[in-house]
Each structure stands twice: as C-alpha cells, then as structure tokens.
C-alpha cells in the first residue's frame, strides 16, 4: 500500500512539474462592433487596438480598452489614394515599432477563389494615422507574386533578426514565408532576389498570423474549413524553419461557426481579442491559460 501511494505521489508530482504544451483558450464574451464592414483583422500596438475591414473602402478604426470591452475613440483611417480605394481588402498589418510598416491586400479575382492577386503596401504608419488616408503615406507597392493564395504580413524574429512572415489561405501547397523587410520595402515583387529568406509548409485556411516573441511561437489564425469555424495553431518557428514544415505545439478549435479573421494578444499572453467577418458578435474577448 505504501509503495502504491509513493508511486501515485511521484506520478502527480511529475504531471504538475511537466511543462504544458501550449495554452488553453476560452471565448469569454462576444461584442458587436459596427462600421467595419466585414472585419478582417486586429492589431494591438502600444495600448492601442486597430480593427480593419472592407466597408465601402478598406479602412482602419482605432479603439481603446474600456473595462473588458473596446471603445471607439473617433479615429478612422481610409485606405484610399486620391479618393480611390486602394487597399480594399486589408489582410494583415506588419508592425514591430521600429521597422517599415506593411499592410497586406488579398484580392479574389474569381468567384471560385482559384485566382488571387496579393499586394503588400509599405506605408508611413505615423503619417497615415495623422492624415487618415494613404495620400502622401504610400511608400511602395509590392506584388506578392511568390504567394499561392493571398498575403497576411506579420513581423517575426528569427536568429535575432526581424522578418515579415506571410501565409496562404487555400487548401493546396500552403506555406508560411519569411521576407527580408530591408529588401521588401524597395522591391516591386516578392520574387525578386533577396526578398524571400525562408519558408515552410502549413495547414490550410490561414486568415492571419500572430508572433509570440517571448515564446518563439507563431500562431496561425485559421478556419477549420473554407470560410467557416475557428482554429488556432501554435507552431515552433525555429523548428518549422529547420524542418521545412510546420512543427505544431498545439491546435485549438473553438466552437464558433462563423469566419474567424484575426486575433491579437494584449499586454500579456493571458487575454486577447478574436475578430470575425460577421455583422454581429464580430469582436470576442478570449481568456488564455498557459
């Protein structure tokens, strides 16, 4: 009996001391945020939350935390140039506070979704926030011709250097690719020499990316099927680059039937917001436990 008790105690101690593989995520509270069109993503920057969507033109709205929800502060940016809609379907804002800022645009060219044009825009982010349009703030337009289906830029760090990661949405030959921002900012297309640094294969339906810098993990924000249901896939970036395929830490499926579009953590990795393209309940507080 004493031996059995000792074994049980040792097992419990082992379980408690073992590192947990990835977090648990739980939907806490849905909110409805209007005037976004179909929300395409969310970016958290120095206490500010930027939600972007495809209303009558591509646009970005700034919010702040108000208790556990978001409050619109009355600041909107239209992604237009000379009153013409340029970034009509924004899909990702690559921002790290020191390198050039890039915004993605994924354009469906046919109803079947087999033909896409993906464009990455290098922008003056501070100027865009001040003036509210791309006039005078569009620095370069880059054709992401290396992509397979769409582009969704996000900064990641690998071997102490920053890269712009992006991924495909479709169900064939999906990849995560890392671009050199110093070369990308002056390029006309991503197939130019020196732009693409590394790549690895990944699972389908990636809507957006999020970099967990302190953990060395890249979060793939996905649908479980085309345009439907929520999936979060945590991958080890360094191992994925080394092997050439995603090295999964954990996959989390949340029981929501609509189209997950984006996600961001807040200051710590214990709380975040997920956004969907729905007209109602399109912004959702998420609790995260590691």
Residue ranges: model-predicted function:
Residues 69-107:
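Blade-loop segments of beta-propeller domains
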Residues 30-59:
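Beta-strand-rich domains and repeat architectures in extracellular enzymes and scaffolds
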Residues 57-64, 110-124, 172-181, 226-237, ...:
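Structural motif
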Residues 243-267:
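Conserved blade-ending motifs and adjacent loop-strand segments that build the rim/top face
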Residues 30-35, 81-85, 141-148, 197-203, ...:
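Surface loop/turn motifs at the tips and blade-to-blade linkers of beta-strand repeat domains
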Residues 199-242:
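Loop/turn-rich, solvent-exposed surfaces of beta-rich toroidal or solenoidal domains
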Residues 48-79, 127, 131, 230:
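Beta-propeller domains
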Residues 38-45, 86-102, 147-162, 207-214, ...:
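Structural signature of eukaryotic scaffold interfaces centered on beta-propeller domains
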């Amino acid at each position: 009996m004493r031996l059995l008790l000792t074994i049980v105690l040792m097992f419990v101690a082992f379980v408690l001391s073992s590192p947990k593989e990835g977090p648990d995520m739980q939907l806490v509270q849905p909110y409805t945020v209007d005037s976004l069109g179909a929300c395409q993503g969310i970016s958290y920057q120095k206490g500010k939350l930027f939600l972007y969507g495809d209303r009558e033109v591509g646009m970005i709205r700034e919010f702040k935390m108000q208790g556990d929800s978001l409050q619109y502060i009355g600041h909107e940016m239209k992604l237009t140039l000379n009153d013409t809609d340029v970034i009509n379907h924004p899909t990702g804002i690559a921002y790290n506070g020191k390198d050039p800022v890039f915004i993605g645009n994924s354009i469906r060219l046919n109803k079947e979704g087999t033909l896409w044009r993906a464009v990455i825009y290098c922008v003056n982010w501070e100027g865009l926030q001040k003036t509210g349009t791309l006039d005078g703030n569009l620095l370069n337009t880059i054709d992401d011709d290396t992509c397979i289906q769409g582009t969704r830029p996000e900064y990641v760090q690998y071997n102490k250097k920053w890269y712009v990661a992006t991924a495909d949405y479709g169900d064939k030959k999906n990849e995560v690719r890392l671009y050199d921002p110093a070369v990308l900012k002056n390029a006309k297309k991503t197939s130019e020499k020196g732009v693409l640094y590394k790549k690895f294969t990944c699972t389908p339906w990636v809507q957006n990316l999020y970099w967990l810098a302190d953990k060395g993990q890249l979060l793939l924000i996905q649908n479980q099927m085309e345009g439907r249901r929520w999936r979060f896939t945590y991958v080890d970036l360094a191992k994925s680059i080394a092997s050439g395929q995603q090295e999964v830490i954990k996959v989390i499926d949340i029981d929501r039937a609509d189209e997950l579009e984006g996600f961001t953590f807040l200051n710590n990795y214990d709380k975040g917001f997920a956004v969907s393209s729905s007209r109602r309940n399109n912004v959702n507080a998420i609790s995260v436990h590691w």
